[in-house]
Amino acid sequence: MNSASRLIVPRLLAALGVLLVAGCGKKEAATAAAPVAPAAPKARVPNTTAQAYYQAHPAFFLFKTPADVPADLKWEDGSDLPTFADPAAKRGGTQYSAIESWPPTLRIVGPDSNNSFRQYLLDDNGIELLKRHPNAPGYTPGLAKTWAVAADRQTVYFKIDPDAHWSDGVPVEADDFMFMFYFYQSPHIQAPWYNNWFTEEYTSITKFDAHTIAIRLRGPKPDPLERAGLQAVPAHFYQEFGADFPQRYQWRVEPTTGPYTLYAKDVEEGRSITLTRLKNWWANDKKFFAHRYNPDRIVFQLVRDRDKAFEMFKLGELDAFNLLVPPRFWYDQMKIPEVDKGYIQKNVFFTFQPRAPMGLFLNSKKPLLDNHDIREGIAYASNWDKVIQVAQRGDARRLHPWADSHPPFEHPTLRALPYDGEKALAAFARAGFTKRGPDGILVNEAGKRLSLTLTFSSTALVDVPPILKEEAAKAGLELIIEQLDPTAAYQKSMQKNFEITLSGWGGGAEFAPRFWEFFHGVNSVKPQTNNLTNTDIPELNQLIEQYDRSQDKDEMIRLSHRMIELVHGDAAFVPGFTQPFIRWGNWRWMKFPASLNVREAEYSGQYGLHWIDEDTRKETLQARRDGRSFERVERVDTKWKTD
């Protein structure tokens, strides 16, 4: 859920896995993955279908001249903000990482696209018009060189950087932003959230010339830049865009404005995916992109078993490893000579951003779960405190109800329901489950057992379900544990074919939390939406619509608090735990800035601040062969610590 970004739909965390890696999917057909980007720039070819759409919607797609740009605008460029990359960073080398399963598609929108691998193609790779600074208030330039907010705080003007190019050499121009709205408003993409957002949140886009546009929001916003700072869509790439879009573009990789691209030759089916850095990337020397995205290549090897991946990391076959969960990797399995001898370094970095909603999502349209008393009983029967103390060894805290750590929108007093066996039994009794069977599980008068399936995929959370199962049984609830491949679990969630799923959403800092995609009834029951709980509460629907239309921050805060109360009362989302830091290990040849990372980092490599020093790699491997040691390194950075 990156602010001011083309990616506004949060990605489902099917796995919390290897560093720079999260759960992905499985490719179903051995078709071509990515067309090789040509060396020479392509000429821009008009998209006739899109142009016809513009003509059919003249109030939305406007064409004016540079003389029509208001003369009194105050243009900004973010140049007063500090940089956050390290000038000492070295460009070059190959980075070795791992993925737990194969991505279900290489599309960036449409069915199955909202998977965790997309971050490497789009979310953390593509460039927006502008982006929130990760350490300080304000925005940094991206595709836009300068921007200006109109006095009505409803229209934002952008001057596109003439240096900006797609990875295939085609310049980024105003036409790509015009096409973006056509693309996301089209039913062909089979993405209801995008259709709604790009139709309801914006009223027009104006092209003044090839490098000047204006985006008009539905109404004035407290932070209009966040809504208007979008990514472009390459119009020239989608000449074949139509009703068969999901199938036609299933394994095609669209050109990117970011530093890394994917070529067909670098997709080894079922083995690895390799990203290549563009040698002449247009933003190489821009103030806020210099000294970032440094490795020439990033190799993602398919390693389905997390313990095997850790062994590869110890051998130096992977450059880094996510040590956040499960904590046994940090506390136990890092007690190794490679750490003591300084070959592998340990890092903890506290972040400050809204906490990703992770916990139990209850499908309220399934039998039993369609009963509020059952859902409330499950909330009381979920012993997250024990999960935190045992599975997480105490270095986490209970997640608050929706919008945790998103002041002032988070609820000031409301907290997640605690584990309470007596209250769980009382709730189950109200639903008719009053007697225990011979194994202690509750049954109703018809003899039906209080039994539900808990689906999860993340090997990083493998210690959590057994604790939840054991504690729930004390309250008469049977949880049948179903662990699936990340792709299967992700697709099951998107098809709404689960009963209870243990999962979370990738998040990020933005002005205000989102509710529509998660809880509005229009997204209930439908596949490929983020309303996993199938929530459909009339009052909540009305408040969400009012919240999304609101032009007043104080009103939005009030509405947010009330919506959180309704979500909490519905008990279809049982908050799990959160950890206000990221934690990883890396071989000493993977270098990080002295500042280590940025305040809003979701994972250590998100902002591309690290680099690979191949000379240090050779030195380290030779030292290991010779038995020589270096200084032991364990960094703990608390400058952004708040909880």
Each PLM stretch: what is its role?
Residues 27-42, 46, 78, 266, ...:
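Detector for C-terminal structural segments
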